[in-house]
Amino acid sequence: MVRIRLTRMGKRKQPFYRIVVVDSRKRRDGAYIESLGYYNPLKEGEIKIDVERAVDWILKGAQPSDTVRDIFKKFGVMKRVHEIKYGKKEEATSE
C-alpha cells in the first residue's frame, strides 16, 4: 500500500519534516517515491504542499497518515478530493 506520511529531517531537537509518498513497508526515513512538500513545526507551523500532486496521489489510492490528513484538511486537499470523487454539492434553490 502507498502512504503519504512525514519523514523526519533536521538536527537533533530541531525537527523538520518532508511530506512524502512512500511504500508503507519502508522505514520512516527510508527511500520515498515523491516529495509533496514540507512541514516545519518550529516556525509557527510553516507548511508548503503541492496541492495538485497531493490530490492526484490520493485519487490514485494513496492513504494519508493521521497527521498528514490533518495538515491536508487545513489546506483544503481533502475537500477537493471529495469534490472530485463525488461532485460538488448543488446549492438548494429556494422559491
From Swiss-Prot:
Keyword RNA-binding found: no
Matching Pfam families: Ribosomal_S16 (PF00886)
One Gene Ontology term, aspect cellular component: cytoplasm
Key words of the record: Ribonucleoprotein, Ribosomal protein
GO biological process: translation
Keyword Ribosomal protein belongs to the record: yes
InterPro entries listed in its UniProt record: Ribosomal_bS16 (IPR000307), Ribosomal_bS16_CS (IPR020592), Ribosomal_bS16_dom_sf (IPR023803)
One GO MF term: structural constituent of ribosome
Protein family (similarity comment): Belongs to the bacterial ribosomal protein bS16 family.
Protein name stated in the entry: Small ribosomal subunit protein bS16
Name of the gene encoding the protein in the UniProt record: rpsP
